Design a protein with these regions (language model features):
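N-terminal accessory targeting/assembly segments
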Residues: 1-9
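Helix-loop module immediately N-terminal to the HCX5R catalytic loop
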Residues: 105-106, 112
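Non-catalytic substrate-recognition/targeting regions of SAM-dependent transferases
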Residues: 11-101, 108
Length: 152
């Protein structure tokens, strides 16, 4: 039986999981295709031809010398989400680019709730005021930025 892999992420034109397997994942951040380790991707890649498009690869075979390797000059991608521009960075010692795209469904929820809050106040003819948000995932600051841009 073929393996059916689905991502639990909302649509975002600046991020895409292209393929995964052999303990790696192939992703597109804006126009930059990267390869990063993913220990839970134990299956075989499904779209082998796409892997040639990778221009940045995180090498973490030796944890002490974990680093990014590039094919040519590669600029860190800028990701756009509405009015927000997220500046990413390739950092040796970390496979992350400073943002977790899989959090986008949560950012969508934050934005949606801010809009519902404003509509609720308007329906009750109450003076506009800012909703209150407690951000419990503040590691990168992305959720806080989305919240601020949404009116929190």
């Amino acid at each position: 039986m073929p393996l059916n892999i689905q991502t639990l992420s909302s649509q975002w034109s600046d991020y895409e999981l292209l393929d995964s397997g052999d303990r790696l994942k192939l992703e597109r951040f804006a126009d930059v295709v990267v390869t990063r380790s993913e220990p839970k991707a134990w299956w075989k890649p499904a779209r082998k031809n796409l892997w040639r498009e990778s221009v940045a690869r995180y090498i973490d075979d030796d944890k002490k010398n974990a680093r990014w390797e590039f094919r040519g000059k590669v600029n860190a991608p800028v990701l756009h989400l509405g009015k927000i521009n997220f500046l990413t960075k390739f950092m040796d010692g970390s496979k992350h680019l400073g943002i977790f795209p899989e959090q986008k469904p949560h950012w969508d929820f934050i934005t949606e709730r801010a809009g519902l809050f404003a509509k609720k106040l308007a329906l009750k003819s109450l003076a506009p005021r800012k909703p209150i948000l407690l951000n419990l995932f503040g590691y990168t600051g992305a959720a806080s930025i989305v919240a601020a841009a949404s009116g929190y």
